[in-house]
C-alpha cells in the first residue's frame, strides 16, 4: 500500500467549540513522509508549525490540544484527526488562523465531506504501520485503556453515566474506511445542560450549542436537540470517534485492538506514551499491497520516535 494525500486544497470556516472564536482552516496536499502538520497562519515565523503527534499533546481537558516547543497551540484536533484517519490520509498540511479547529456540527462527518470533495491521491512512498506485539494498558481510577495484538485495527468502548438518557453503552467496530463513515463519523460530541455555566467559567464550551453538540437536560432524562440522536447509541460512538482521532497521533497506523472503558483524551494519550516507552511492545511493519488488514494511515514513525 502507498501513502495518500489530498488531490487539492479545501477549506472551511466555523467556530471553536471551547474558544467560541471564528476560525478559518484550509487542508493542503503535502509531500510523502511529511505527515499531518498544523500551521498557525496568524503567527509569524517557523514556530507556527505544530506536528500532529502524541508527543505534542498538552492540555487534555475536554479536548486534545497540541503544543509545539515554541508554545504555539492548536486545540480540539480529535474530530479532524479522526476524519483524516477514516479517509486514510497520510500527509496533510492544515493551515488555521486561530488556536482551535472549528467544531462544525460536533462530529467528523463535515471533515470527511471536505476530504471527499478535495479528492485523494496515492503517493510513491509505502505505508507503514505500528504492529502491537503485547498488551499495554493504563488505569486511572475507573478509567482504563489498552492496546492488544490484532491483525487489523478495531475499537471497543464502554461508557456508564448516571443520566438515564445515556446510561451504560458499549460499542465494538472493526475499522475500515467504510465502517468508519457509516457507523462512527456522524456521532456528535455531547454534554450536560447543568455543566455549561461551569465549563464557560473555565474558558471552555464557549462555542458550544445545540447546533454542534448533543445536550442532555438537567434531569438527565432527555436530549434537548430537536432532531434527536443520529444513532441510538450516539454517545458511545462519539467516544469511539474521539479515540480514533487521538490514536491517529501515534505516528503511524496501528495494527492492534483498542479497548477503552470510560477513557478520555488524557488516558488515551497516556496509553500511547506507555506504548512507545516499551520498545518490546511494538514493531514497525510495511503494509503489503492489497492487505485486507490494512489499518488507517498516519505519518511515518521516524517523526514520532524523535518526539
UniProtKB/Swiss-Prot annotation:
The keyword Transferase does not apply. GO terms for biological process: lipid A biosynthetic process. It comes from the Bacteria. It catalyses: a UDP-3-O-[(3R)-3-hydroxyacyl]-N-acetyl-alpha-D-glucosamine + H2O = a UDP-3-O-[(3R)-3-hydroxyacyl]-alpha-D-glucosamine + acetate. Gene3D superfamilies: lpxc deacetylase, domain 1, lpxc deacetylase, domain 2. InterPro entries: Ribosomal_Su5_D2-typ_SF, UDP-acyl_GlcNac_deAcase, UDP-acyl_GlcNac_deAcase_C, UDP-acyl_N-AcGlcN_deAcase_N. The active site is at 265 (proton donor). GO terms for cellular component: membrane. Its cofactor is Zn(2+). It holds the Pfam family LpxC. Zn(2+) binds at residues 79, 238, 242. The keyword Lipid metabolism applies. It is an enzyme of class 3 (hydrolase). GO terms for molecular function: metal ion binding; UDP-3-O-acyl-N-acetylglucosamine deacetylase activity. Keywords: Hydrolase, Lipid A biosynthesis, Lipid biosynthesis, Lipid metabolism, Metal-binding, Zinc. Its EC number is 3.5.1.108. Pathway: Glycolipid biosynthesis; lipid IV(A) biosynthesis; lipid IV(A) from (3R)-3-hydroxytetradecanoyl-[acyl-carrier-protein] and UDP-N-acetyl-alpha-D-glucosamine: step 2/6. Catalyzes the hydrolysis of UDP-3-O-myristoyl-N-acetylglucosamine to form UDP-3-O-myristoylglucosamine and acetate, the committed step in lipid A biosynthesis. Belongs to the LpxC family. This is UDP-3-O-acyl-N-acetylglucosamine deacetylase.
Amino acid at each position: 500500500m502507498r501513502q495518500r494525500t489530498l488531490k487539492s486544497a479545501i477549506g472551511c470556516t466555523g467556530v471553536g467549540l471551547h474558544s467560541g472564536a471564528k476560525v478559518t482552516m484550509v487542508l493542503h496536499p503535502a509531500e510523502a513522509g511529511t505527515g499531518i502538520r498544523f500551521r498557525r497562519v496568524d503567527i509569524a515565523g517557523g514556530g507556527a508549525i505544530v506536528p500532529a503527534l502524541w508527543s505534542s499533546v498538552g492540555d487534555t481537558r475536554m479536548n486534545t490540544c497540541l503544543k509545539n516547543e515554541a508554545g504555539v497551540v492548536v486545540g480540539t484536533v480529535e474530530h479532524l484527526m479522526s476524519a483524516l484517519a477514516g479517509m486514510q490520509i497520510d500527509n496533510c498540511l492544515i493551515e488555521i488562523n486561530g488556536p482551535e479547529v472549528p467544531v462544525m456540527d460536533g462530529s467528523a462527518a463535515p471533515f470527511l465531506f471536505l476530504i471527499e470533495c478535495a479528492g485523494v491521491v496515492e503517493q510513491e512512498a509505502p505505508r507503514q504501520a505500528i504492529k502491537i506485539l503485547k498488551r499495554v494498558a493504563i488505569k486511572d481510577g475507573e478509567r482504563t485503556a489498552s492496546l492488544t495484538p490484532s491483525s487489523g485495527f478495531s475499537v471497543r468502548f464502554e461508557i456508564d453515566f448516571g443520566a438515564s438518557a445515556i446510561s451504560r453503552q458499549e460499542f465494538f467496530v472493526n475499522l475500515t474506511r467504510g465502517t468508519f463513515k457509516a457507523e462512527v463519523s456522524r456521532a456528535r460530541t455531547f454534554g450536560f445542560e447543568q455543566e455549561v455555566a461551569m465549563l464557560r467559567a473555565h474558558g471552555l464550551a464557549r462555542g458550544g450549542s445545540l447546533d454542534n453538540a448533543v445536550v442532555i437536560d438537567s434531569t438527565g432524562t432527555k436530549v434537548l436537540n430537536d432532531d434527536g440522536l443520529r444513532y441510538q447509541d450516539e454517545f458511545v460512538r462519539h467516544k469511539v470517534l474521539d479515540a480514533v482521532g487521538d490514536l491517529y497521533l501515534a505516528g503511524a497506523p496501528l495494527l492492534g485492538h483498542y479497548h477503552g472503558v470510560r477513557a478520555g483524551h488524557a488516558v488515551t494519550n497516556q496509553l500511547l506514551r506507555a506504548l512507545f516507552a516499551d520498545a518490546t511492545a511494538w514493531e514497525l511493519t510495511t503494509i503489503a499491497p492489497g492487505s485486507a488488514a490494512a489499518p488507517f494511515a498516519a505519518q511515518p514513525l521516524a517523526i514520532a520516535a524523535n518526539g
